């Protein structure tokens, strides 16, 4: 019913001037086009539900006059430019609203967000309680409910573990996202062992992604190898140096903030398609003495992930690592190790037969025991790959006898019980 002139500009007739609310639900309007809503001089409320937005929504795209917004039905996890946060050295926070809000209706995925929404809620709690700000969130059934910072942990064993080790986060049997961790729990490592018998890790994200948790290690194991546990997607924080996930089905492990990550071990994950370590400013970037040490050196183990397509390392000209172990990756398409110049232990099991296996271009051969720079193991299928033959020729068959440290050390052992290492030294001798 709106009228536009020949240049496509809105004519400010009575209809346009009197428009205070606008339903744009299901229109798939891009967020870049939202700035054009400022042409309605009295528009304050807009329905943007079911528009396919996500994983982030940027409030800076909204005209300042829009104070009421419905984002339900979208898959949004991050709410950029809703608030700004300044954290003092003592941990105190100064939160500032970046966009005036009188109504905020959120999708069910908003329950995952702590960084933006919980701080907005805490900053504006008095207005929300008084009804000056109408803040709601849909539940799993799509029904709007009053927004709350309380979150459930469905698995009773996980609940027990978290209440025992991170009690400061809880309000009764629910995690309260508005609570802070005390000093003793703030840096505590997260270790859920097989003996803890967890089969559903729903709720763990509220600790892993909590900005007030500064633990360095995440080690999560399901109840057993035959019991694959479920887990929601997680975004790992900047304090994390080690991630271990075994027998857990999770679609996405976001490591974009994990700049201190040094070690990753993912085993038996039927859902993961990508593992990206490229954000780390630590992995593979220490000196040879550090990286050649089994305790402090960089490590990557990816075993039994049947639909994993891509692994990425930091994009540096020279990487050094203690361990790289990839086995039973039936769908692997992309993993370039050519910038790895030193690795103490290299294990290559069965991989996608069409995968172009690019080996490390080794130039540094350091060993704490003074014997071999790189201990190498592979499966028989991998042994017969052309690139493996070339790697062995360059680093084992044609070595300089005057080398003080042998380039390749022999081992036939692989880590993954569903893969068998071959006696590659014997197979080489048979080829002579």
Predicted regions and their residues:
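Extracellular beta-strand solenoids
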Residues: 48, 59, 71, 78, ...
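Right-handed parallel beta-helix
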Residues: 222-269, 279
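N-terminal capping/linker segments that flank leucine-rich repeat
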Residues: 1-41, 75-77, 81-227, 233, ...
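Leucine-rich repeat
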Residues: 30, 54-55, 77, 112, ...
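Conserved hydrophobic beta-strand positions in leucine-rich repeat
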Residues: 20-24, 44-48, 67-71, 102-106, ...
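Extracellular beta-strand/beta-solenoid scaffold signature
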Residues: 229, 276-299, 307, 320-323, ...
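Conserved "Asn-ladder"/turn position within leucine-rich repeats
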Residues: 27, 51, 74, 107-110, ...
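Short "repeat-start/strand-capping" segments in structured domains, especially the N-termini
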Residues: 42, 64-65, 238-241, 257-262, ...
